[in-house]
Amino acid sequence: MKNNYTSLKSPLDEEDELKTDHEIDLEKGPLPEYDSEEESTLPPYSDHALVNNPPNTHRENHSYGTTDNSSPLLIILLISFTSIILFNAPEVCYLKYKDAFFKNYGAAEWTLFGFWCLVCTLALIFLTYFYETWTKAVKVTVISLAKCVKVTAIFLAQCVKACGKGIKHFLKKWENMPMAFSEVFLFNILVGSPRMNLRYIFGDRWGLKCSLADHIIFVVLSILVFIAETVKPGSIRVNLIRKMGYEAKQQVNEYTAVPLREMNSESEA
């Protein structure tokens, strides 16, 4: 069978391809003449040259601006030694307080002191060798504690704010609630105490006995007093107290306003 395949490209497209193949890349410039046997004379932008000599762009980009962040050895030793001193300061202060620091030391005390110095020396070496590790751990711990303190403070502030709003709303809606509690308290003092005394003194004569019904009746009366005061916000007693306060305030204002009027009249005269 004959292949009847015909190219879809037009003659104009084929001429454009031939032109582009023979055109010179203006960015790279003309290709230099080189010997195919010598590898060193390959053009710099050929594929073979790129494989043999990969660009060091990543290394060159990161070669500038790099600084050595390692701390000097003297500073590391100073920080490690300071941390050991702070760790041993409470023990030294305690021995000074007991007046037992380098005083009447025996073999056991000097042995313990030598072991203590050995431990401090090993700790200094350890802290110096693992300086970056333990400093990072300390930083992370301090940051975590600061965040915990911040979250706790915010939580407590929100709790206090919510409690304040709740108390304010409670007092606004049930403004006579404190008066109800005070009335129940006074009722228990004025009625409960004489009741117990009368039962103790005249119990045998009048036949008064401590029964469950007596306690239930007293509790029910206390609850009724509380309900009678809180069933309607702004009871007569609360309104009476407000009225007395308002009248007292007006009297004070009147007493203070009279001398001012007299002083103004005298100054005008």
Curated annotation (Swiss-Prot):
Residues 19-30 have a biased composition (Basic and acidic residues). It is a multi-pass membrane protein. Keywords: Membrane, Transmembrane, Transmembrane helix, Vacuole. GO terms for biological process: meiotic drive. It comes from the Eukaryota. Its main location: membrane. It is found in: Spore membrane; Vacuole membrane. It holds the Pfam family WTF. InterPro entries: WTF. GO terms for cellular component: cytoplasm; endoplasmic reticulum; vacuolar membrane. Coiled coil: none annotated. Residues 1-65 are annotated as: Disordered. The chain crosses the membrane at residues 73-95, 110-132, 206-228. Acts as a suppressor component of the dual wtf meiotic drive system, and can suppress but not confer meiotic drive by compatible poisons. Wtf meiotic drive systems promote unequal transmission of alleles from the parental zygote to progeny spores by encoding a poison and an antidote from the same locus; the poison is trans-acting and forms toxic aggregates in all spores within an ascus, wherease the antidote is spore-specific and targets aggregates for degradation by the vacuole. Homomer. Interacts with other proteins that exhibit high sequence similarity. Belongs to the WTF family. This is Meiotic drive suppressor wtf5.
